Amino acid sequence: MTRAAERGQGATGWGLRGALMAVALLSVLNAVGTVFVLYQWRELSAALRALEAQHGQEQREDSALRAFLAELSRAPARVPEPPQDPMSAARNKRSHGGEPASHIRAESQDMMMMMTYSMVPIRVMIDLCNSTQGICLTGPPGPPGPPGAGGLPGHNGSDGQPGLQGPKGEKGAVGKRGKMGLPGATGNPGEKGEKGDAGELGLPGNEGPPGQKGDKGDKGDVSNDVLLTGAKGDQGPPGPPGPPGPPGPPGSRRAKGPRQPNSFTNQCPGETCVIPNDDTLVGRADEKVNERHSPQTEPMITSIGNPAQVLKVKETFGTWLRESANRSDDRIWVTEHFSGIMVKEFEDLPALLNSSFTLLHLPHYFHGCGHAVYNNSLYYHKGGSNTIVRFEFGKETPQTLKLEDALYFDRKYLFANSKTYFNIAVDEKGLWIIYASSVDGSSILVAQLDERTFSVLRHINTTYPKSKAGNAFIAQGILYVTDTKDTRVTFAFDLLRGKQINANFGLRMSQSVLAMLSYNMRDQHLYSWEDGHLMLYPVHFSSTAPSQR
């Protein structure tokens, strides 16, 4: 305990010593600062007294000079006397004996003024020269001063005269091809060219209307030959047996009993048949139906080949079309979006790839992605109506056809994936329209058209619900329907026989939006518009008879 107490007392003593030393150091610094401040104060006081003395001396000199100048300004001005002759001057010298004294005073005054001026500050001299006139004489001009700082830039001057044209420059690089301009004026007809080679044999045309009855011909000459009727001869021997006849149509199956075949009838269940306006078409339509119901089998699609991409555009919806009938017509037509009034016409495939086109203005707005081109005419759905428009290229007046009881409003699309109410199709058997009925609102129907009169020959009800369909196309008189994802063909219907047939094959692997799907009989390819990708699919047919359900 004693050692701990000693250690505590020692620590306390060292702390007190340190505090005392700090206080002493502060006191010393304070004293030194006080002495330094007093020294500075003394120096500043001496400088202030010197400045006050100098200022007082300047004031005294200034007041003395001002008094002298005031006295000088009150002195009378000396007027110069006219020159005198020598005799007068002599008399004046004799009569004015005291003049030399005044001359001496003037010299002394001048000397005093010079001495006074030499003691005057420059500022006072400047004030004196400015306030009085005649005392300060103007000296010679001084040397020129240094150049001043540059001034602000002036205003822009007016344009000068155009210079001479320079030499022609070097030829630049070839620029990008510009857009096609407006059509120019019609030029003069050129010279008649040589006759070209004969083209390929085209498809047979449609049967023309019967001609007018001709005039009665002239009466023929009287024949001089006399034909006598002979007696009836004996019966000849029997001939050899003839070749076997063609097989008859298949009979109906009656084993299943309850199930009825889905055959076509003229009643059009759930739909009103359109009767052609021309009475002569009734017999002709029956002939065509009987013709196409012949026992000859139509080829059926068995598979779809690998696709080839033609072009990529930015629009999700659209159609690209080629002429189906005329093989020599290489034009391509493109509609962008599922609604519009403009059509792009390309001269050929290279023009499509180079985006070189001509804009065509349609007479009515189109809707959907189910258009078709057939015999130089564009077939499309007139937006907001149940009307199909036939617009012949190069003509201004279109033709229209109404489909009664067809869905065309309230977004109850035939194919929701492509925003389409009507899908026009062209194949080897003619012109078709795929649509949905507004009576039941669920089944897919097909109307067969007479292309010559632009009228409906008959309506075919496939009884297949449109809710299960993604898109559809027609080839060789058979309707093919895809699933809702547009990846497989899951339904087929023979439109010529009015019966469903077995079909199930893959279409594509992509899950993109399939806005357009159309068969072209010209090259037997499927044309599609898939989320801006313009694609081509080769079609493979089978010649065997399709199995029916």
Curated annotation (Swiss-Prot):
Q: Which GO terms describe its biological process?
A: clustering of voltage-gated sodium channels; microvillus organization; signal transduction
- Which residues lie toward the Extracellular compartment? 39-549
Keyword field contains Transmembrane helix = yes
Q: Where is the signal peptide?
A: none
Subunit: Homotrimer (via collagen-like domains). Interacts with NRCAM. Interacts with NFASC/neurofascin. Interaction with glial NRCAM enhances interaction with axonal NFASC. Interacts with MYOC.
PROSITE patterns per UniProt: OLF (PS51132)
Gene that this polypeptide is encoded by: Gldn
What the entry says about domains is: The olfactomedin-like domain mediates NFASC/neurofascin and NRCAM binding.
User: What is the protein name for this chain?
Assistant: Gliomedin
